[in-house]
Amino acid sequence: MRQVCSFKREFAGKELKIDIGKVAWQATGAALVQYGETTVLVTVVASEDKKEDVDFFPLTVEYVERLYAAGKIPGGFFKREGKPTEPEILFARLIDRPLRPLFAKDFRNEVQVIVTVLSYDHENSTDIPSIIGASCAIILAGLPFKGPIGAVRIGWDGNEWYINPPVTLSNSLLLDLVVAGTKDAVLMIEGDGKEVPEDIFLEGIIKAHSAMLDVINFQEEILSQINPAPFNYDPFVVDERLKRAVLDYVTVDQIRDAIFTPSKSERQKALEDLKKKVIEHFKPIYGEITAQVDEIINQEAKKILSQVVLEEKRRVDGRKLNEIRPVSCEVGVLKRVHGSALFQRGETQVLSVVTLGAGEEQIIESVIESEPKRYIHHYNFPPFSVGEAKPLRGPKRREIGHGALAERALLPLIPKEEEFPYTIRVVSEVLSSNGSTSMASVCGSSLSLMDAGVPIKTHVAGVAMGLIKEGDRFEVLTDIQGLEDALGGMDFKIAGTRNGITAVQLDIKVDGLSYEIIERTLKQAKEARYQILDIMEKTIPQPRPEISPYAPRIMVLEINPSKIGDLIGPSGKNIKKIIEETHTTINIKPEGLVYISAPDQESAEKAAQMVQDYTRDIKEGDIFLGKVIRVTDYGAFVEILPGKIGLLHISKYKTTGTGKNQTREEINLGDEILIKVDSIDSSGRISLTRKDL
């Protein structure tokens, strides 16, 4: 007999409802979560057997938006949702981040979490109910998980704090964060700010953590009533006999020498050679032991790293704990692109390239409404950047996530369309990777934007912070490299200007962070950011005064909205003529803004003049140089502006002489003559005159 239960709780002023046992009966665990009128179904399925010979926990999180949830029909020919969109991938990564560190370290069974958006009320975002639902479904499945966890979105508008603010308020917020955690610590932080000071940022995290405690208690009440059976699994355990044998065969000093090798590639080779040596020696005795040897060597390397940091206060590359790697910057490295920069920090190297376009905003199909994107950042991580040979299969989730993070870091500095009417695309190519490539992309983007002449008011820099923790002892590491990321407990990416933070993302491998750790991390990151900004500002202190000669020219005109029809013309005749004659692209906004994109300044100016001619108001007394397009017995029809034709009656021709000697001028087809507007009748018909000219 299935147990069907429904639980309700007020959460941040709205009803949170969780239904258990109502749907998805074949899943290991499932929760139907409704917040406001936004509804998500979260399912968890765990395989019965552990995955052999893997040195990681095989967790997959999928977030799926059904467009019917927002009353939409998918675009395209098939009218059906396809592969995951960028927002879906970013939401999946967001949900994954606080879940992963809380699973038991000896749990190696495959787990798949699927979040399906069923209803969206255009007010309550789907991210918070998704994280809460995932936590609830996992604990009710009985999986070895140190939950439950809570999550809130917190916003600050400069005066007030908002817990789970409505989506409609997001554009007015100076700080917008998603924070997840347990009762005792913070697990995940992700969000953006408009140059928010560190003390405000920390205050927001503390308020968010306090607000989520109620929803954690709510899940504990549900758990106590349901009382699910624990999930039986075969734990991954290192064979103690093998461990002793390995550490007798390979000394701690050999492992220490390997991780203290200065170069990343040499360090990796030294560690891999050690592992191969051990596997070849013990495989005939113990059989397949690759995963176990990886675990043994990695745990010993982690112990050595912790000892060096916590006891000796130094790092494997000789740096102090709060020291950044050597930084170098170069701009204008590619001659025909619109802007470029090469940013290098230690062995991490990123090339960022800017392209300026017109009217090419990115439209994203999602249940959550979003404005077309004028600023786009793409991040590429080719295999050669880590010395590997792999097939290229398009951007992976990590690349999409890193690209979005670096995009958010620069977004508050991007000028409004009225100030700079270009669509801006930055592509960051990772040429060499030894940690913190996403933050190097932030720095490279900032440099390349200034090189392109994009009027950002100041530079943005980013740095990744790490953590070594044993019990209550901890040290925060500034500007972590790959080894410190792999063996450490935290990857806290923080980007911003001298005025404050613009974007953050926290990944952890420990059970959570205290406020003390977060506060120290923010302080060290600020110091490091200032050092990096010093170097960037010396390279290019402000945007170039002119954009690249190879970039398109854009002019913006403002016309009376009532004149849009005149500009377009019958069946688009007028606008087509401008485009064909000037080789430009023209975009007309309903409010009367006309965007002209041209290959050069001359074409832009010619198109602008034609737009002004088509939309100009004609008044009595105006004088034009017109062209005669038809001659009749009673006068001539003269085009005074494109599409604007008036009648010059023969009585209004210019005359010479007086009395019987008076003669009327001769006007022929094709003549260009100076003409004056004599009158305009109520129907808009124009009468012209040549007299008194």
Curated annotation (Swiss-Prot):
Q: Name one GO molecular function term.
A: RNA binding
Report any Pfam family annotated for this entry. RNase_PH
Q: Which UniProt keywords apply?
A: Cytoplasm, Magnesium, Metal-binding, Nucleotidyltransferase, RNA-binding, Transferase
* CDD domains for this protein: KH-I_PNPase, RNase_PH_PNPase_1, RNase_PH_PNPase_2
**Superkingdom, taxonomy of origin:** Bacteria
Q: Which residues form the S1 motif domain?
A: 621-691
Give the residue range of the signal peptide: none
Under the heading SMART domains, the entry gives: KH, S1
Q: Where in the cell is it found?
A: Cytoplasm
An example of a Gene Ontology cellular component annotation for this protein is: cytosol
* Catalytic reactions of this protein: RNA(n+1) + phosphate = RNA(n) + a ribonucleoside 5'-diphosphate
Disulfide bridge map = none
Give start and end of each KH domain: 552-611
Question: What Gene3D superfamilies does this protein's entry cite?
Answer: GHMP Kinase, N-terminal domain, K Homology domain, type 1, Nucleic acid-binding proteins
Task: Name the coenzymes or cofactors required.
Answer: Mg(2+)
User: Entry's InterPro entries?
Assistant: ExoRNase_PH_dom1 (IPR001247), ExoRNase_PH_dom2 (IPR015847), ExoRNase_PH_dom2_sf (IPR036345), KH_dom (IPR004087), KH_dom_type_1 (IPR004088), KH_dom_type_1_sf (IPR036612), NA-bd_OB-fold (IPR012340), PNPase (IPR012162)
Q: What is its EC number?
A: 2.7.7.8
Q: Which GO terms describe its biological process?
A: mRNA catabolic process; RNA processing
What is the recorded function of this protein according to its Swiss-Prot or TrEMBL entry? Involved in mRNA degradation. Catalyzes the phosphorolysis of single-stranded polyribonucleotides processively in the 3'- to 5'-direction.
PANTHER family hit by this protein: POLYRIBONUCLEOTIDE NUCLEOTIDYLTRANSFERASE (PTHR11252), POLYRIBONUCLEOTIDE NUCLEOTIDYLTRANSFERASE 1, MITOCHONDRIAL (PTHR11252:SF0)
Q: Which HAMAP family match?
A: PNPase
Q: Which family does it belong to?
A: Belongs to the polyribonucleotide nucleotidyltransferase family.
Q: What is this protein called?
A: Polyribonucleotide nucleotidyltransferase
